[in-house]
Amino acid sequence: MVRASSSKKGGSKGGDKDDAESKQRKRLKTLALDNQLLSDSPAKSHSSLKPSKQVLKHHGTDIIRKSQRKNRFLFSFPGLLAPISAATIGDLDRLSTKNPVLYLNFPQGRMKLFGTILYPKNRYLTLQFSRGGKNVLCDDYFDNMIVFSESWWIGTKEENPEEARLDFPKELAQAENTEFDFQGGAGGAASVKKLASPEIGSQPTETDSPEVDNEDVLSEDGEFLDDKIQVTPPVQLTPPVQVTPVRQSQRNSGKKFNFAETSSEASSGESEGNTSDEDEKPLLEPESSTRSREESQDGNGITASASKLPEELPAKREKLKSKDSKLVQATLSNLFKKAEEKTAGTSKAKSSSKA
């Protein structure tokens, strides 16, 4: 019974601590929402960062993730930090609870940041790109983050051991070192540029696309409405060049070639009839060249060619016969038939001679 009573008392004390932590957590969460560190709805970025050369080089490669034994937390501060040198910026305390505290060290004293552990819907990771462009290594993967939404100035430990809230010194309000740069990472957004230089306006070199509300364009079923989507025609900077179409024909007009293969008998007849003229002519000779040669000749040449016509007619007839004759494939049956015809012809000649 004593143990039961003692456990009840301990449970009541633990419940009071849990209630205090939950109240502190709710207060810090509402404060982060008021300061626009967090948002219930997904944020719409007005300006997106351009991908670097390494990201474009590793486009489409595999992301390799190694197992992690230690829990890693992502910090979200209410402002931008610009450390002068690489060193420890502070100490993290009460990490075992849901409301950790971070102490930032300054030459004038310390700053106390109150935070709470939250589990966002977005996932954050850090990537390490290889030089060859084969793969990408995922160093850290953050499922949870610590949002520091409230900051106190507590001074030094000797002056303020109880860590009561003090006024910020005037020296921290004035920026002494101006060599820091917030153009990389999340500092490249348009909101950071407006805060850094509100008086100087920047002229964008690229034309921004028109903003279209998705709620007006989408129907109740989630489909796009054709009536509300406006498409602007592209602007032609240079006038189009008109090119006249040209028909390119692969045939040679006015030229006729003779590729017919003549038989052995026709070739022998041609060699006997026209040994002087046909041997000198090329195999592939266009008719235009022959016409020009005949026109350039004198009257004597014309009569001579006319006298040679009857001699060339039988040779041309043999050519036509060779063209009209069907090509017969040399097979074994054809060869045997030819051999039988030859033997029959020789036997007839022998019988006639004997008679």
From Swiss-Prot:
<dbReference type="InterPro" id="IPR038859">
    <property type="entry name" value="RHL1"/>
</dbReference>
<feature type="compositionally biased region" description="Basic and acidic residues">
    <location>
        <begin position="281"/>
        <end position="296"/>
    </location>
</feature>
<dbReference type="GO" id="GO:0005730">
    <property type="term" value="C:nucleolus"/>
</dbReference>
<comment type="subunit">
    <text>Interacts with BIN4 and TOP6A, but not with TOP6B.</text>
</comment>
<feature type="compositionally biased region" description="Low complexity">
    <location>
        <begin position="344"/>
        <end position="355"/>
    </location>
</feature>
<dbReference type="GO" id="GO:0042023">
    <property type="term" value="P:DNA endoreduplication"/>
</dbReference>
<feature type="region of interest" description="Disordered">
    <location>
        <begin position="181"/>
        <end position="215"/>
    </location>
</feature>
<dbReference type="GO" id="GO:0048766">
    <property type="term" value="P:root hair initiation"/>
</dbReference>
<comment type="function">
    <text>Component of the DNA topoisomerase VI complex involved in chromatin organization and progression of endoreduplication cycles. Binds to DNA. Required for endoreduplication beyond 8C.</text>
</comment>
<feature type="compositionally biased region" description="Low complexity">
    <location>
        <begin position="260"/>
        <end position="274"/>
    </location>
</feature>
<protein>
    <recommendedName>
        <fullName>DNA-binding protein RHL1</fullName>
    </recommendedName>
</protein>
<feature type="region of interest" description="Disordered">
    <location>
        <begin position="229"/>
        <end position="355"/>
    </location>
</feature>
<feature type="compositionally biased region" description="Basic and acidic residues">
    <location>
        <begin position="309"/>
        <end position="326"/>
    </location>
</feature>
<dbReference type="GO" id="GO:0003677">
    <property type="term" value="F:DNA binding"/>
</dbReference>
<keyword id="KW-0238">DNA-binding</keyword>
<feature type="region of interest" description="Disordered">
    <location>
        <begin position="1"/>
        <end position="26"/>
    </location>
</feature>
<feature type="compositionally biased region" description="Low complexity">
    <location>
        <begin position="230"/>
        <end position="246"/>
    </location>
</feature>
<feature type="compositionally biased region" description="Basic and acidic residues">
    <location>
        <begin position="14"/>
        <end position="23"/>
    </location>
</feature>
<keyword id="KW-0539">Nucleus</keyword>
